[in-house]
From Swiss-Prot:
Belongs to the LipB family. In the reaction, the free carboxyl group of octanoic acid is attached via an amide linkage to the epsilon-amino group of a specific lysine residue of lipoyl domains of lipoate-dependent enzymes. GO terms for molecular function: lipoyl(octanoyl) transferase activity. Substrate binds at residues 66-73, 133-135, 146-148. It is found in: Cytoplasm. Its main location: cytoplasm. This is Octanoyltransferase. The gene is lipB. Catalyzes the transfer of endogenously produced octanoic acid from octanoyl-acyl-carrier-protein onto the lipoyl domains of lipoate-dependent enzymes. Lipoyl-ACP can also act as a substrate although octanoyl-ACP is likely to be the physiological substrate. Pfam families: LplA-B_cat (PF21948). Keywords: Acyltransferase, Cytoplasm, Transferase. InterPro entries: aa-tRNA-synth_II/BPL/LPL (IPR045864), BPL_LPL_catalytic (IPR004143), Octanoyltransferase (IPR000544), Octanoyltransferase_CS (IPR020605).
């Protein structure tokens, strides 16, 4: 699995690059993790409803092809796009989602933060507050899009939406629990290590 650090990049070109990568895959294409941050942007998934955008401001809204509803990306949030051929790995989308959740939970545990997935709601939570979001697109036996983990960011734009369609959803981030807060790059080193562990053949075959 190849890990590519892209830094702070605009959302729309990254979205187009994901689609291009997935469309051009073949049986020998190596899976990749893209580690990025984005300038402020709202992304509206396939299930998104306009009424979940509560306040219209100068933050752009991009309609995209992942599952789920509306979320926010901004600087200080660690985003990892998972370009994974799940058929070749003989695994399932559910197992991939679990691997993403488990990797986030293990990463947060390294910082002394107790987090958990919620079977009734997508994402990872600290208590009732959401600290990470997940969203995937399944196409041609592969997945793309991925996860977003709040590290040290301005959370106020989340109040302009119903995050992932949930009214009143409270958000949190690593900076609320750890000071000095690690940088997104420091968190990325731990998170990608856990992702690599989760996506070893042993993990893939543990269905």
């Amino acid at each position: 699995m190849k890990i590519i650090h892209k830094g702070l990049v605009e959302y729309l070109p990254t979205f187009e690059a994901m689609k291009t990568f997935n469309a051009g895959r073949n049986a020998d294409t190596e899976d990749e993790l893209w580690v990025v941050e984005h300038p402020p942007v709202f992304t509206q998934g396939l299930a998104g409803k306009p009424e979940h955008l509560l306040i219209r401001d100068d933050i752009p809204v991009v309609q995209i092809d992942r599952g789920g509803q509306i979320t926010y990306h901004g600087p200080g949030q660690l985003v990892v796009y998972t370009m994974i051929d799940f058929k070749r790995r003989k695994t399932s989308v559910r197992n991939i989602v679990s691997a993403l959740e488990n990797s986030i939970i293990a990463t947060l545990a390294e910082y002394g933060i107790e987090a958990a997935a919620d079977p009734k709601r997508p994402g990872v939570y600290v208590g009732e507050r959401k600290i990470a979001s997940l969203g995937l697109r399944i196409k041609n036996g592969s997945v793309y899009h991925g996860l977003a983990l709040n590290v040290n960011m301005d959370l106020s734009p989340f109040t302009h939406i119903n995050p992932c369609g949930y009214a009143g959803m409270e958000m949190t981030q690593i900076a609320d629990f750890v000071q000095p807060c690690p940088t997104p790059d420091e968190v990325a080193a731990k998170l990608t290590a856990h992702l690599e562990t989760q996506f070893t053949p042993k993990a893939d075959n543990n269905e």
